[in-house]
Amino acid sequence: MEIILQDTVANLGKLGDKVVVKSGYARNFLFPQQKAVPANKANLEAFETRRVELEAKQAANLAAAEKRGAALAALEAVVIASKAGDVGKLFGSIGTRDIATAITAAGVPVVKSEVRLPEGALRNTGLFEIAVVVHSEVSTIVKIEVVQAE
């Protein structure tokens, strides 16, 4: 199915690109989230009239994401206290929800879907560098310090 992207989609294309995707991906994901429209003559003309508006909206979203990214980069190490054994192994683990809550409490709002833990949940005490992706083009590293709770 040929579509016109109305927003930048990771690994697919940028605003205004005409791409071919599987019809299920278009119907079930891209169309409901208004990230794309079917590529027909009427939609192509409608898109061209709205192009400036969509580009301005995308630029505003990117500027807001860069501002949040700068605020996240300016954070000192965020401390999370958790129960742990004598050798520093946690009783349980610290996942994306716990990290997002701690960063939000530190003053910068973050949702758990923006936190990336490629190696899985944190299971030990120590200092960790966590990637936070606030926009498809903006990502930053936040230092998380896991300490033993008293």
From Swiss-Prot:
An example molecular function term from Gene Ontology annotations: structural constituent of ribosome
Ribonucleoprotein among keywords: yes
SUPFAM superfamilies reported for this sequence: L9 N-domain-like, Ribosomal protein L9 C-domain
Top-level division of the source organism's lineage: Bacteria
Pfam families, alphabetized: Ribosomal_L9_C (PF03948), Ribosomal_L9_N (PF01281)
PROSITE patterns: RIBOSOMAL_L9 (PS00651)
A Gene Ontology cellular-component term: ribonucleoprotein complex
Any GO BP annotation: translation
Function noted in UniProt: Binds to the 23S rRNA.
UniProt family annotation: Belongs to the bacterial ribosomal protein bL9 family.
Name the UniProt record assigns to this protein: Large ribosomal subunit protein bL9
Organism: Psychromonas ingrahamii (strain DSM 17664 / CCUG 51855 / 37)
Highest classification ranks of the organism: Bacteria, Pseudomonadati, Pseudomonadota, Gammaproteobacteria, Alteromonadales
